[in-house]
C-alpha cells in the first residue's frame, strides 16, 4: 500500500511536468500562411490577355521563391504551387524541368542549387535555355501580413511585363 502511494505521488509530479512542457510547446508561435488564394489572385491577373498573350507553347523559367522573411517557408513547395496554378490556367505554358535547371546551374558555375538567383543571372540563365519568360517570386515582411510578389519578365528585353503583390495571412 505504501509503495502504491509513493508511486501515485511520483506519477502526479511526472504528469504535472508533462503538462508544463506541453503548455510551453503550445505557446510556441507557429505561423500558417494561406498562399493558395494569394497565388490564385496574382496568376489570374497575370494571365489576362492584356498582360501576356500566349497562343502557342511557351517555355517559362521559375526559380525558387525568394524568402525575405524571418520565418521558415518551404520555398520549393510554394514554387511548385505557383507552377501548378499557371499550368491549370493555361496548358500552352511549359516550365524548364528541375533536372535541367540543376544541370544548367552547375554548368554556369552556380554551386548552391537551392539558392534563388538574382534577376540578371536568371535572365542570363533563361537566355541560355531558350526561355521566353522568367517568373520571379518573393515573400517579404517581418510580421503578418506577409507579401507575396510575382514578377513576369520578358527574357528577350529584361522588361518586367507584369508585377503584383498580394497579402498572405
Swiss-Prot record:
GO molecular function: enzyme regulator activity
InterPro entries assigned: LpoB (IPR014094)
Gene3D superfamilies: ABC-type transport auxiliary lipoprotein component
One cellular-component annotation, GO: periplasmic side of cell outer membrane
GO biological process terms held by the UniProt record: peptidoglycan biosynthetic process
Pfam family of the protein (one): LpoB
Disulfide bonds: none
Stated name of the protein: Uncharacterized protein BU358
Biological classification of the source: Bacteria, Pseudomonadati, Pseudomonadota, Gammaproteobacteria, Enterobacterales
Amino acid at each position: 500500500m505504501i509503495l502504491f502511494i509513493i508511486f501515485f505521488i511520483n506519477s502526479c509530479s511526472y504528469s504535472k511536468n508533462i503538462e508544463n512542457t506541453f503548455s510551453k510547446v503550445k505557446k510556441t508561435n507557429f505561423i500558417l500562411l494561406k498562399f493558395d488564394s494569394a497565388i490564385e489572385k496574382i496568376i489570374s491577373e497575370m494571365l489576362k490577355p492584356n498582360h501576356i498573350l500566349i497562343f502557342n507553347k511557351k517555355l517559362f523559367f521559375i526559380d525558387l521563391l525568394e524568402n525575405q522573411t524571418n520565418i521558415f517557408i518551404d520555398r520549393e513547395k510554394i514554387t511548385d504551387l505557383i507552377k501548378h496554378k499557371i499550368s491549370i490556367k493555361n496548358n500552352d505554358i511549359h516550365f524548364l524541368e528541375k533536372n535541367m535547371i540543376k544541370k544548367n546551374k552547375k554548368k554556369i558555375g552556380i554551386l548552391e542549387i537551392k539558392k534563388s538567383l538574382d534577376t540578371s543571372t536568371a535572365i542570363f540563365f533563361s537566355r541560355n535555355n531558350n526561355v521566353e519568360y522568367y517568373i520571379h517570386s518573393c515573400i517579404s515582411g517581418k510580421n503578418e501580413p506577409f507579401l507575396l510578389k510575382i514578377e513576369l519578365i520578358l527574357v528577350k528585353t529584361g522588361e518586367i511585363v507584369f508585377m503584383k503583390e498580394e497579402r498572405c495571412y
